Regions:
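NTP-handling and nucleic-acid-processing catalytic cores
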Residues: 1-149, 153
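Short secondary-structure capping/junction motifs at helix and strand boundaries
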Residues: 9-18, 185-196
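A glycine-rich phosphate-binding loop feature that marks nucleotide/adenosyl-phosphate handling sites
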Residues: 18-28, 194-205
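Active-site cavity-forming subdomains of large catalytic enzyme subunits
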Residues: 144, 178, 201-204
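Short, surface-exposed amphipathic charged segments that create phosphate/polyanion-binding patches used
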Residues: 152-155, 205
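Phosphate/diphosphate-binding loops
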Residues: 169-193
């Protein structure tokens, strides 16, 4: 009865929203079941480009998520990027047009200070997605592999061909393919640099 009352006054509703999922155990995971561990990775300095080809660089440990990019985000107080808010750039390899936006959760001293928001790489992506009302562009299946079908938001023929090269691959295999392609296209600045970060893991994993 309590639920029906909530439903009648609009207090109960359905919503599409991201959840935590373990690809090994194939199960949903509660926040209480997460534990933070140090995890080694690599920063990749990647060029997004304005209409005239001028680059703007982000640094990411998850280049395999480039196809899921919805926007670039920097802190509203970051003088390096204030002039770019509201402008658009194109993602490397996939040539998807994305906006440059401001959000206070962007860390000025992390990487290049400007980050790509992908749906979804971490909880910060979820926060940005909700607050800025960004599109949802999932590319990873429940089994941890890249989806088989090329998404509709990738319209550039070369971009669709690039995505097809990663379809069905694990994120680790897709990462190598993407990094090699970025290097060949001239969109990877220098070589990846080692880093360590705290990452949430399922406590049983």
């Amino acid at each position: 009865k309590a639920f029906l009352r909530n439903l009648a006054r609009g207090g109960a509703y359905q919503q599409d929203a991201p959840g935590l999922w373990d690809v090994t155990f194939q199960t949903a995971v509660a926040q209480a079941e997460l534990e933070s561990r140090e995890y080694p990775g690599f920063y990749h300095k990647v060029a997004f480009r304005f209409e005239d080809g001028t680059p703007i660089y982000i640094e990411t440990t998850r280049p395999e998520l480039l196809a899921a990019c919805t926007s670039l985000i920097a802190n509203p107080n970051d003088e390096r990027y204030k002039q770019y808010f509201g402008q658009y750039v194109y993602s490397p390899l996939f040539k998807v047009k994305v906006p440059i936006l401001a959000h206070p959760a962007a860390e000025m001293d992390k990487g290049a200070g400007i980050a790509m928001c992908c749906t979804f790489g971490d909880v910060t992506d979820v926060e940005w997605w909700r607050d800025l009302k960004l599109p949802t562009r999932p590319i990873i299946q429940r089994n941890g592999r890249i989806v088989m079908d090329t998404p509709d938001w990738i319209t550039d023929p070369a971009g669709r061909e690039m995505f097809a090269a990663t379809a069905g691959k694990t994120t680790f295999s897709a990462r190598k393919i993407i990094v090699d392609a970025l290097r060949e296209a001239g969109d990877l600045d220098g070589e990846p640099t080692p880093t360590k970060r705290m990452t949430n893991f399922y406590e049983k994993g």
